[in-house]
Each structure stands twice: as structure tokens, then as C-alpha cells.
Amino acid sequence: MTKISKRMKSLSAKVEDKSYAPLEAIQLVKENANAKFDETIEAHIRLGIDPKYTDQQIRTTVSLPKGTGQKVRIAVIAKGEKVAEANSAGADLAGEEELIDSISKGEMNFDLLISTPDMMPKVAKLGRVLGPRGLMPNPKAGTVTTDLISSIKEFKAGKLEFRADRAGIVHVRFGKASFSPEDLLENLKVLHEAIDRNKPSGAKGRYWKSLYITSTMGPSVEIDIAALQDSKEE
């Protein structure tokens, strides 16, 4: 049984068992983010989907207008002039066979992997290593592309890839505790729109089941989904 710390008990006591208006929830999460570092703010969204069916899966990207506040380390697998192009665009790592070899050995000092289409047959062989970590490049996520310059700049600026896990829950970071409540809310609205826009064709019944936000070291707070929808229309 997991022991709950006195700090977490104290913070959890501030959160009522109810769904909050979006801005109120964000302010409460920020108030509880009192660790000695700039905590990441995350959203955990339960959707009415069963990802074991291909027509109920969601995997896409979203460009957060206020960014994520987090430095993203990007690796690029390409060859020839594309390697130089990736480096000039700000990739942290770029290469061909040597990078593939280091990844196969478990050396993955990056948060995102981009590949050019011609390298995907070789990258596919790294599935056992990349797959469990959610790092396999995918065209739907914008990580298989010939336009390396645009892709790298977009992901560095705050573009995020997200997907639902096996339970149909999407986990996404959308800012830092140091962000203003208004900036966090703007990012959350854009995330909400992206999930709606990419609703799987096989989704049945109520699409949005629940939405909780939390900081790295704080308790979760439920957001009133209807209120979030209303705030988007204001």
C-alpha cells in the first residue's frame, strides 16, 4: 500500500470532490505546485474509446500557442544533405547508420525521434526499442517527413504528439506552473479542440468521459468539461 506524504495530504485537503470551472481548476493546481522546481502541468483525459479497435484510436499532434515551457531534445535519422539540414534546423542529434546503431544499443538521449521516409525501413527494425517508449516515428504524428526544417522548428516551439493509452486515456503536458492561468487555459482550449477534431470514427456514446489536471508533485483536480466547452465559445 502506497503511503501518502503529509505534504500530499495537506494539498489534497484543498481540493473538493467536485468538478471545477477551468480557470478555477488551473489556479488551484498552480497554488498546489509548491515544489522547489518549476512543475509541469499535465492533463489526463478519459475518452469514450476502446483503442484495441483500429477505428477507436487517436494519435495526433497539437501546437500549443503558449508552448510547453520544456526543452525538447530531438534526434533525426536521415542521410546525406538531410543530416546537415537537420543540424542547421536545431536538431540535438542527427545521423544515419551510426545513430541507428546507438539507438539499437539503448542509447536514447532524446525526447522525440524524426525520420525521413527513405530511412523508415531501417528505423522500423528498432521497433522493440522505440515502440515501448512511444518514440517510433509516425506520419500521423508528423515525425516521418522530408520537411525537416519545419518539423524541427514546430516541435521545438511547442508542438506535441499525443495518443490514448490502452485504457483510452490521453496524458498530455500543457505548460509549467510558472505560466499564467490565462496562458495555461489557452493551451488547454487548443488541446481540447485538437482532441475533438481528431475524434476516432468508431467512437460511440459520450466522447469526453472526464478531464483532470495536475502538477508534477500535486494532487489532481477535475475540470467541468461542459464549462471548458463554453469557455472556448466566449
Curated annotation (Swiss-Prot):
Keywords: Repressor, Ribonucleoprotein, Ribosomal protein, RNA-binding, rRNA-binding, Translation regulation, tRNA-binding. Binds directly to 23S rRNA. The L1 stalk is quite mobile in the ribosome, and is involved in E site tRNA release. Protein L1 is also a translational repressor protein, it controls the translation of the L11 operon by binding to its mRNA. This is Large ribosomal subunit protein uL1. SUPFAM superfamilies: Ribosomal protein L1. One of its GO terms (molecular function) is rRNA binding. InterPro entries: Ribosom_uL1_bac-type, Ribosomal_uL1, Ribosomal_uL1-like, Ribosomal_uL1/biogenesis, Ribosomal_uL1_3-a/b-sand, Ribosomal_uL1_CS. Belongs to the universal ribosomal protein uL1 family. GO terms for cellular component: large ribosomal subunit. Part of the 50S ribosomal subunit. HAMAP family: Ribosomal_uL1_B. It comes from the Bacteria. The keyword Glycosyltransferase does not apply. The gene is rplA. Coiled coil: none annotated. One of its GO terms (biological process) is translation.
